[in-house]
């Protein structure tokens, strides 16, 4: 992508839909390689992975409310979004702005090199980059369909 820093969020999202031939491509190798390049292998906060067939969003919302009431700064990564892409990354209930997401996409794009990332992989890496900058005490990381083979699982304590 040319002039990636001057792209709007809409432009970035359109681009992300085109850079991988499949919507879903199971495996953690691509995410792991780019995460290492971005320095995202060791996150400076606790990560709670939320997985399961149903209720992940509700579980994240409830856990976030409890943790915030206890005085913690809480990040929540969820997918898919309902209305706006920025819903996927929230800190203490607040979405980050389009410019923050564009900056994160620029970082992922620079780190990925010739690795073709799916939309979800790219978005997850961008989200983790944003959370590292936002410095929550705890991150609730929702895992999508596919469970252990999905990008957020790379940061699970049982992953590589």
What are these regions (language model features)?
Residues 1-7:
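ATP-dependent carboxylate-amine ligase
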Residues 7-11, 22-24, 28-43, 69-157:
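ATP-dependent carboxylate-amine ligase catalytic core
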Residues 46-50, 58-75:
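A conserved segment at the C-terminal end of the G1
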């Amino acid at each position: 992508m040319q002039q990636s820093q001057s792209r709007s969020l809409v432009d970035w999202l359109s681009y992300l839909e085109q850079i991988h031939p499949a919507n879903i491509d199971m495996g953690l190798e691509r995410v792991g390689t780019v995460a290492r390049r971005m320095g995202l292998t060791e996150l400076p906060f606790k990560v709670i992975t939320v997985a399961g067939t149903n209720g992940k969003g509700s579980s994240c919302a409830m856990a976030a409310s409890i943790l915030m009431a206890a005085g913690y700064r809480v990040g929540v990564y969820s997918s898919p979004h309902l209305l706006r892409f920025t819903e996927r990354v929230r800190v203490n209930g607040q979405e980050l702005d389009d410019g923050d997401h564009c900056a994160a996409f620029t970082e992922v794009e620079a780190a990925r090199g010739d690795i073709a990332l799916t939309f979800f992989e790219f978005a997850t890496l961008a989200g983790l980059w944003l959370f590292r900058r936002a410095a929550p005490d705890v991150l609730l990381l929702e895992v999508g369909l596919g469970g252990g083979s999905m990008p957020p699982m790379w940061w699970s304590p049982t992953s590589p």
